[in-house]
């Protein structure tokens, strides 16, 4: 009985990690590591008004609909990690498919979007 409880607890704790990894969602802390250690490029796929209200320091704004046409100019080195961001993580998850189609291999979506970034106490800047 105790072994079953331990296995069940372990599976429940591991499930969100596996789900995040398979969906491409990236925690805010992991995003910071990629930015600092691997010079990841951060692209915010929100609309310009949302971007102006607050965005990750150093991020570039390319609305989701413009991504296929403008991503190559903003993220020239396809070998660097690319972190896509939006308010909640929904648009950035959709943007991942477009980025992969354009040849970007190290593409991530910030899990939970800017809401998760703010919850982690990480800084934002406004235009």
Residue ranges and their predicted role:
Residues 1-40, 48-81, 90-127:
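Rhodanese-like catalytic fold shared by cysteine-dependent sulfurtransferases
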